[in-house]
């Protein structure tokens, strides 16, 4: 029988795995990345973060036989009709890296001024206790800010260097890990998840 503490993260993103391991370090879980278990990535055909997270969690739970935690997240720019949104990881193409995605986003927003540069990070986390879990836990966090015109900072990953936190004015890549955990969309979603697990 599979130990419930062995939880698979339905992601091949090593940065995301490291961040979630840090954020969940006090839980009795052993978090394993999908890549470590040779679980292939599923198609993510949906148009919402919630649907994509459910697809990923169910896929990982089915193939691993373990509890599965999925995170679908991205940056949303209202002036771009919500783009990059659910396509954040592949905004500049299926094989794009963070730099290419950032470059495309900055190019698409170069004429935007003031409030039009507002944006938000969105994170939806789903926990499924089996592939047939009839009531998965769904948690969502939002982090509001605005787009920088140039990348700033060396920390974080993804779009962090161009996301300016609304309260501090620092980019997500300029924040310490502790500051980021407190403010971030992922930190907020995980706080909701913890509350649901405790309740």
Feature annotation, model-predicted:
Residues 2-8, 14-32, 36-199:
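Anionic-ligand binding patches
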């Amino acid at each position: 029988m599979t130990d419930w503490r062995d939880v698979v993260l339905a992601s091949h993103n090593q940065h995301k795995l490291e961040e979630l391991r840090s954020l969940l370090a006090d839980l009795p879980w052993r978090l394993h990345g999908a890549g470590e278990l040779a679980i292939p990535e599923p198609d993510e055909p949906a148009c919402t973060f919630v649907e994509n997270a459910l697809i990923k969690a169910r896929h990982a739970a089915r193939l691993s036989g373990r509890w599965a935690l999925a995170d679908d997240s991205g940056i949303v720019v209202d002036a771009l009709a919500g783009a990059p949104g659910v396509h954040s990881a592949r905004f500049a193409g299926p094989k794009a890296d963070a730099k290419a995605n950032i470059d495309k986003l900055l190019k698409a927003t170069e004429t935007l001024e003031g409030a039009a540069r507002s944006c938000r990070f969105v994170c939806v986390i789903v926990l499924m206790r089996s592939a047939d879990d009839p009531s998965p836990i769904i948690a969502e966090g939002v982090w509001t800010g605005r787009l920088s015109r140039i990348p700033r900072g060396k920390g974080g990953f993804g779009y962090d260097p161009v996301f300016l936190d609304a309260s501090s004015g620092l980019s997500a890549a300029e924040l310490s890990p502790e500051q980021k955990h407190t403010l971030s969309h992922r930190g907020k979603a995980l706080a909701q998840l913890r509350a649901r697990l405790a309740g």
